[in-house]
Amino acid sequence: MKVSPRLNSALLLLFMILATVMGLVTVEARTCETSSNLFNGPCLSSSNCANVCHNEGFSDGDCRGFRRRCLCTRPC
């Protein structure tokens, strides 16, 4: 009993697609937040906050909250 080359190609393609889909498991790291020690005054610009946070060694920063504080973020 001979298997056709088209069937072999189709099965190989199916297995490759399944292996690719099953291999795409994404793990998301937790993010830790800390108030900036160097930022002074109300936080009106998230880009300024991010620059100050980068200088403090964090990966990013954002203005948040009612009091508009600069919060620095990094992976935990």
Swiss-Prot record:
**Disulfide pairs?**
32-76, 43-63, 49-70, 53-72
- Please provide the record's keywords in A-Z order: Antimicrobial, Disulfide bond, Fungicide, Plant defense, Secreted, Signal
Listed InterPro entries: Defensin_plant, Scorpion_toxin-like, Scorpion_toxin-like_sf
Asked whether the UniProt record includes Disulfide bond among its keywords, one would answer: yes
| Keyword match Nucleotide-binding | no
* SMART domains according to UniProt: Knot1
Q: Which CDD domains match?
A: Knot1
| GO annotation, biological process | defense response; defense response to fungus; killing of cells of another organism
Instruction: Report the locations given in the UniProt record.
Output: Secreted
Q: Known Gene3D superfamilies for this protein?
A: Knottin, scorpion toxin-like (3.30.30.10)
Span of the signal peptide: 1-29
* Record protein name field: Defensin-like protein 5
Organism for this UniProt entry: Arabidopsis thaliana (Mouse-ear cress)
Gene assigned in the entry: PDF2.4
